[in-house]
Curated annotation (Swiss-Prot):
Organism placement in taxonomy: Eukaryota, Amoebozoa, Evosea, Eumycetozoa, Dictyostelia
Catalytic activity from the UniProt record: tRNA(Met) + L-methionine + ATP = L-methionyl-tRNA(Met) + AMP + diphosphate
Keyword Ligase: yes
Species name: Dictyostelium discoideum
Similarity comment: family membership: Belongs to the class-I aminoacyl-tRNA synthetase family.
Gene Ontology biological process terms from the UniProt entry: methionyl-tRNA aminoacylation
Location of the motif 'HIGH' region: 52-62
Motif ('KMSKS' region): 352-356
Protein known as: Probable methionine--tRNA ligase, mitochondrial
A GO cellular component annotation in the UniProt record: mitochondrion
Amino acid sequence: MLKLLKQISTTSTFKKPSSINNGFININLFKNYCTSVKQEDKKKVLITTPIFYVNGPPHIGHLYSALLGDALGRWNRFIGNDTLFMTGTDEHGSKVDEAAKKNGLKTIDYCDKISNRFRELFDKADIKYDDFIRTTEPRHKEAVTAIWNRLLERGYIYKGVYKGWYCTSDESFLTDDQVTEGMSPITPQNPISKKCMISLESGHEVNWIEEENYMFKLSEFSKTIENWFEEVKPIFPAIHVNLLRYMLSQGIKDLSISRPSSRIPWGIEVPNDPSQTIYVWLDALTNYLTVTGYPNVSPNSSQSHWSNATHIIGKDIIKFHSVYWPSFLIAADYPLPKSIICHAHWTVNREKMSKSRGNVVDPFLAIDNHGLELIRYFLLKGGGLENDGDWSEHELAVRFKSDLADTYGNLISRCTGKALNPSGEWPKSVTDTSLFTMDDQKLIENSSILVKSVSTHYDRGDFKSGIFEIMTFLYECNLYVQNQAPWKLVPKPNRVGSDLIRLNTIIYIAIEMIRITSLLLSPIIPTSSNLTLNYLSIPLENRSNPSNFKFGYNYHQNQNNLKLPKEILILFHKK
């Protein structure tokens, strides 16, 4: 098992490049360092979001999960990986059946309606998924049947009687240590709270049940899973491992992986036993194999994207993805995921989002009211992997004005306007490095450090930290232009001391910073980034591959297009 664990790579750390020495740079070494993202053979990568439960319409938290996956997918395509990014909907279980009845629809018709709503949201939000899986699809039933049979054949499934606590809302069994006396939560369906046993994990009501189920030998994998946590460190951020360590230290019992079909009819039946329905979590988790072509393509095959899988999940489902799922995979003799990126939740003005409070944020309305690019930016910068993000209309306005309009947008309009460039021509490449001042060198050096640091953040799905560093650097770029005062160098009648060479150098460096940061922002705000790169006449072939982070792009390579566009690019119109 440890051999398997060590095969999963860990993220490398950033070291200050040897080309930097006391604020000056060896320009030749620096040019090599600018291709700072490691060039490797193209590899298959699988990126997954949770599949979203269709017992209700999508909310802003669902969109956040999908955006994390989308940004990670875009980044992996940028660096040249053969990327399969999937999302989808989880459509089985009692809660879905109940929701369909409340809406007066057949269960499959209800699933179609809500699943389509998720797809509409992701299309509206420019989520570039490669596969949208539904657990009601025939291909998924085939995959679930296959993994059930494999676990059965390998001796990890047996029939037994389960006695214990069951939470219908969470569709999860709980031990005595995971429940306590409490009050049932108030919901539209149950407006009066009552004394009952509740889950310590979710606060939802639990009931004692005794029934015959198929059981999975989960207890056999406790030590192996613990070793996986310690040896491979697959869960990011590591803070989320603490709860799992505690859970394992308390001991884990065998897991019921079926329900009587008389109680849970809406699901995939156990092979050769129609009296039982497969547990919704074994069903749902298997979707990650379904999208790779399983069972027709083995997860052990080098041709499968499963060989390098990253799951993006919310903290509320970490137990299922980090204990149950790897145990199923080990039992089936399939590789484990490379990493599990676990994110926190969203509050609204520091309050928990809930229907009873009436503060659930509709993502469709949010995009309509604020525009897609701002919503993408706000969620990816404001959301948290460790701590909950907070939805605030005030913060939306602040982020728009401070970051997008005043910092990124201002640098673009400032450096391409006629005030600094009355000739309206692209600046010439600066090949004579003796023309660089210490301030020039420092900014170029910092752009290289930025690329390396942001790449490290992006590789592990920490877009919040990456965006923070980009915006800090863009603020530095604006300060650089302010301090260099290029407007004093623009030739004008009766002006003495104009210096066209120095003016060209300042504008060239500033525009290069715009190009490099636009590439870095392309997974976050793809439309705005592409509009900027279009404006700079950057060909499509120069908008991917880490080599394009290299400082020194020749804007004069197209001799037929030496002029800047006549109209200044204004990406973000202030309201």
